[in-house]
Amino acid sequence: HMRAEYKTPTGLPDSSAVDLMAELVESQNEIVIRDSMILCAFAKGVTSNEVMVEAYNSITGQSTNWSELKSRAAEQWDLARAWNVSYWQRLGHNPKQQDLLSYRLRKDPLPDGIAKGMVGFVDDEDERFCIEEYYRLRGWTVNGILS
């Protein structure tokens, strides 16, 4: 469930996605809220933010708002990241290396379909820029570790 998607279709990936990293982070945080409330992943967008806040406040007895829920979701994402980083380091793996898409998604063009001939990023530099921007937005170090 620790995934995200873009809120609106972005079209075929024929240009850098670096400008979409902020939307990706926001989407991930919203998915954490939805998953924490045990809402169906396939019903994304059906339950409004206001209803989720009202439900949260009713269940917990707290008085919070959507912005605070998103902040808590970011903390939850960071906790999951911290666990992953610790695990990877115990195995001797570099966290930044673990964030790369598989070789196949990065280098092997799709053989058919609407995105025929495309790969995950425009090029290696684009992939690096996207990862660096994602880390920056999350407040992590350049190596993908919580700061």
Region roles according to the model:
Residues 1-147:
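Extended C-terminal regions of large enzymes
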